[in-house]
């Protein structure tokens, strides 16, 4: 959504003015029908929210595409492409977001309850846009679903404070991920499978998740859920979405109750990356054809080895190291990062 008083011409002039101030960049016109860059996306998401509220059945976006070419090839040397992308993102996108938001507030006198969601900036090389990706690997918690399952388990079991204390200790560096994970799982001992089933029923898919998986599969992608969470929930979500395969931690369950243990090895960040690599090798897919999407620090290893690592409404450290960041749209924003002009409606 853009302020009504900001036209297509304004955007073109704005980008050109930024380029005029940058001695390192040229703006190249690659298509004459620039007005056709306005795109409507129809997202057929019908899953209910946690409050059983009706979700809007579509996301509308206005897309502007420009080819920025460096004056010299220095910026595009291997190892510097991400830095070049962040120059554009930090300077052009940040300023554009600020100015457009200010214009919107001035023209609409927006109240404090109104919010203008604009500008996700994806920097793509021409070679990247022409590349055919075949494997898409997703994190689960806060990516394919809106919740963090361990938090939901802790709330239900009444051990929220204990779990939080372990998490904070890990963040202070007092224990590694595997140790903190094992301690949190131990606190789940005695929880019945009835409780697990109840939590499954309350999990909500992220906006655009159903359409994104459906569209990727229609495009020929093999889809994988790679989670540091639990298979009990990951398999349920994968079934809801039609994801091809699942990798997560298997909770030990005995006589209908959680034992407080998981089967080793624990799926941590390094294991996630290994799973992605082994899956690609098994399917005969090059790593240059792999896309990984996540939100947490434990997703960074798999994002780093993929051709495209996408941060989805992620922590700052993840956004800073990702190839692309989605902050405005639902998961369907992945298709912009992949270079698709629009996401066609799906049933």
Which ranges hold each PLM region?
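Residues that form generic nucleotide/phosphate-binding pockets
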Residues: 18, 99, 103, 156, ...
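Residue-level marker of motif borders
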Residues: 134-136, 168, 290
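Alpha-helical substrate-recognition element adjacent to the catalytic core
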Residues: 59-62, 67, 127-131, 140-251, ...
């Amino acid at each position: 959504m853009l302020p009504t008083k900001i036209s297509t011409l304004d955007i073109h002039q704005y980008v050109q003015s930024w380029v005029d101030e940058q001695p390192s960049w040229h703006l190249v016109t690659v298509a004459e029908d620039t007005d056709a860059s306005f795109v409507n996306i129809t997202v057929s998401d019908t899953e209910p929210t946690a409050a059983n509220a009706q979700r809007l059945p579509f996301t509308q976006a206005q897309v502007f595409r420009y080819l920025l070419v460096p004056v010299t090839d220095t910026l595009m040397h291997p190892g510097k492409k991400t830095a070049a992308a962040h120059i554009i993102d930090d300077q052009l996108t940040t300023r554009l977001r600020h100015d457009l938001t200010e214009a919107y507030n001035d023209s609409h006198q927006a109240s404090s309850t109104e919010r203008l969601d604009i500008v996700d900036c994806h920097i793509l090389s021409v070679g990247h846009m022409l590349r055919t990706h075949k494997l898409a690997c997703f994190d689960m918690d806060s990516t394919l679903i809106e919740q963090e399952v361990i938090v939901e388990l802790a709330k239900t079991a009444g051990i929220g404070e204990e779990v939080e204390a372990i998490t904070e200790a890990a963040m202070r560096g007092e224990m590694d991920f595997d140790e903190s994970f094992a301690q949190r799982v131990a606190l789940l001992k005695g929880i019945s499978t009835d409780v697990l089933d109840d939590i499954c029923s309350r999990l909500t898919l992220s906006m655009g998740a159903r359409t994104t998986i459906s569209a990727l599969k229609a495009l020929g992608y093999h889809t994988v859920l790679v989670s540091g969470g639990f298979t009990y929930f990951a398999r349920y979500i994968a079934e809801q979405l039609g994801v091809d395969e699942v990798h997560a931690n298997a909770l030990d369950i005995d006589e209908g109750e959680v034992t407080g243990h998981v089967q080793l090895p624990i799926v941590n960040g390094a294991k996630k990356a290994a799973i992605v690599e082994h899956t690609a090798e098994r399917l005969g897919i090059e790593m240059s054809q792999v896309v990984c999407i996540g939100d947490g620090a434990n997703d960074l290893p798999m994002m780093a080895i993929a051709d495209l690592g996408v941060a989805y409404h992620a922590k700052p450290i993840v956004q800073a190291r990702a190839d692309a960041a989605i902050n405005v749209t639902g998961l369907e924003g992945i298709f912009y990062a992949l270079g698709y002009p629009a996401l066609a409606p799906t049933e």
